[in-house]
Amino acid sequence: MKITYTSILSAICSSILLLGFLSVYIWKKQENYSLYEVKLLIFCTVLTGVRLFFPIDICGISHTIGIKILYPELCRFMRGKIGFLSHFSVLFLISLLGSFLILVQKSLSYISFIKLIKEIRPIEYIRVKKYKKVKKIPILKVDSIEDKFIVGIKNQYIIIPNIDEETKKIVLLHEVGHYIKRDLFLKCFFEILCLLYWWNPLVYIVRYYFSNILEIRNDLIVCNELSEIEKIHYVEILLKMSRTKALKRRGTLSFLMEVF
């Protein structure tokens, strides 16, 4: 069991194939999914992430497949030397350095953000029952943000923009769904992947698809608990928030285009 340039290339290639299949499937479905299909997509996407997270050759299980196009030249390049280090070692060290710098930047941003929200007084607390335990999650209203989200590793906070009471009820339904399913930890897993493979655009595509699939899964689960009228209201509120967010971004882009 070891990590080599061939095992890393193998992990990337197998992940590309699986991601290609997922991309075609998602494109053909046009977001018309059943809950079973969404769960299967989540499993396949996590499987892709795990393969990238553990790019190892397992003795007795891994088998070499002969590829005569590009791969031999790439292997020869990786074995080449720069002084006493191989090209692979140099690239590996650069990758580690990049990961370290990104980790420092993200950690500082996260710490400063958590410090900021801890200074905000919660507008209320919501009680959530999970695994026979009841937890109080503080709800914070922040006027400067455009979207709702849940944040925090040890202690979670639900952050919401300045919205009316009716919209807030729908938003809390949505965010509590993410909390119960531990979606935040799954997203953290893919953030770690992006940290390790910052040079590989594949992981950003995987993260994007995975985030969208989680949103679809969450909406399907929430809607299963609502009446038909409540479902329509739920979708209308979320669409309204998405439209408002898109319009604000478009306005910002228009302003920047006029300035520059």
Regions found by a protein language model. Give the residues of each.
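Membrane-embedded and juxtamembrane structural elements of multi-pass membrane proteins
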Residues: 2-64, 68, 81-260
